[in-house]
Amino acid sequence: GLVALADQAKLDTAPTPYHLGFLLGPRINAGGRVGNADLGARLLMSENSEEAEGLAALLETLNTERREIEEDVCANAFKQAEERGLDKPLVWAAGENWHPGVVGIVASRLKEASRRPAVVIGIDAGEGKGSGRSITGIDLGAAIQNLVEQGVLLKGGGHKMAAGLTVKTQEIEIAMEKLSSLIKQKGIDDKEPPSLHLDSVLMPNAATIELVEHLEKAGPYGAGAPSPRFVFANMQIIFAKRVGEKHLKFSFGDSRERILDGIAFDAFKSAIGETIEQHSGRRFHLAGRLELNEWQGRRSVQLRLDDAALLQAQAA
């Protein structure tokens, strides 16, 4: 089953935790999100190659459908959230007929973009069913359970980093205001700029294949043990090119002429994509995670970009 799924994902190298989490995992889950929940389990249990290939192809189709639905909901949710402000203690959005199978994914995207707890709610038949994602230090599940006990929400619960809720449509605004207040009491306020945890400063010549291999052996990583995030300070952008409509491929280096490749997914959903694309040789602080890229039998290190800061020109 996994071999058939890897073929559909065009994965031709030994899978890493990243591949499992971001290539194979979403395809296995696609059945539960927009199709039949048992498809992934049937694929993994299949001992017949023909059956496995058929199930993998079906999951690939459903995953494509899931992405299309997700992109539509994501665009609308981001528009709403940006109008309210991505610097609020809680970032949230709600819409009619938003597919329940993608609201959690969209909430994750909002959380990553804002670095705030985020909730996305799909409205249907007078009720809103939503999913939330949190950040370190904010117990979203407990906050939602608090609102259930107060009678603000019909039901809800979860854990520190993720939770679900059900609320009457006419109560959504009030419920989100109360949830935002609870989160603010825990230490997030709308005047505090979002922060990004950084583990170490690194120079391009230290970003070796051996280093990345050692980091991979220390995994797998997750919410409780995130993969290390490095800063490359005062780097000059050498090359930048848009990949598709949303992503950015680039390379950067220091004065010692050591050049490293980078990739920024969904870069053009913020100012990062356009700013780096139109770099004109300017210098940036770059923050992200290191990974191995394999292409045509060649292995190299690349930076998966999380954030960037343009260095302001210094006065002479």
Spell out what each predicted region is:
Residues 1-171, 242:
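Hydrophobic helix-and-loop "lid/oligomerization" segment in the mid-to-C-terminal part
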